[in-house]
Amino acid sequence: MLISHATDVVQQRAYVQESADSIALAAVIGGQRSANALENILQVTITKLVLTENEAVVHVRVGQFTATSVASHGG
């Protein structure tokens, strides 16, 4: 039972981090609208999104799990 729970936790954490990474990439390319569209598709909550000219920083939550990701592009 413990291994099963640990596996579930790892999978949930990975999902949240992958979602944050994907949303950060979408945001740096397509802005707020793209980030929100992916948020809805992935069924996560963006708790913070900071966009600059060349960078997106996103904080995502799913249940008790949170993740942060930064994406940038050379410009």
Question: Where would I find each of the regions flagged by the language model?
Answer:
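Alpha-helical assembly-interface signal, strongest on the long, hydrophobic N-terminal helix that forms
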Residues: 1-36
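Short amphipathic secondary-structure patches
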Residues: 22-75
